[in-house]
Amino acid sequence: MLDFVNLVGSEACMERIETVERFNEIIAQDEPVVAIFKTSWCPDCHFIDPFMPELETNYAGKVTFVEIDSEKLLDVAQQYHILGIPSFVAFKGGKETIRFVNKLRKTRPEIEQFVDRAIAVSAAV
């Protein structure tokens, strides 16, 4: 199965984190990082795939988006108590700043509102 993110142009190409070391390196940045915890089998995770590349492009220079497969990086998912997917967790300087987790399917406006809030919180810390 082809992955939608790999089919889009170079403007939006969310990095998939494959190692704990890379995850720690990315979240240590001084700019906000939004980590999206997903799995390959989660329908709600795939629901967001069509609009995430555009969202990533719209927020370029303000926030970095990364994707984490919660099953492949189980240690990271457990460290941050990721129980539901998709889960959005924002970081700055290696510390969690805010998260967006609930049992419901996430919509584009909700995700945009979360990212705006993550940027604002990041600016305040």
Predicted regions span which residues?
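Conserved redox-active cysteine motifs that mediate thiol-disulfide chemistry
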Residues: 37-50
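Short active-site neighborhood of thiol/selenol oxidoreductases, capturing the structured segment around
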Residues: 28-40
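Short hydrophobic/charged patches on amphipathic alpha-helices used for structural packing
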Residues: 23-24, 74-77
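Non-catalytic, surface beta->alpha helical segment in thiol-disulfide oxidoreductase systems
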Residues: 90-125
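N-terminal "domain-start" segment that seeds a small globular fold
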Residues: 2-25
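Structural micro-motif
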Residues: 80-92
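Thiol-based oxidoreductase modules, predominantly thioredoxin-like and allied folds used
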Residues: 16-18, 37, 52-56, 60-75
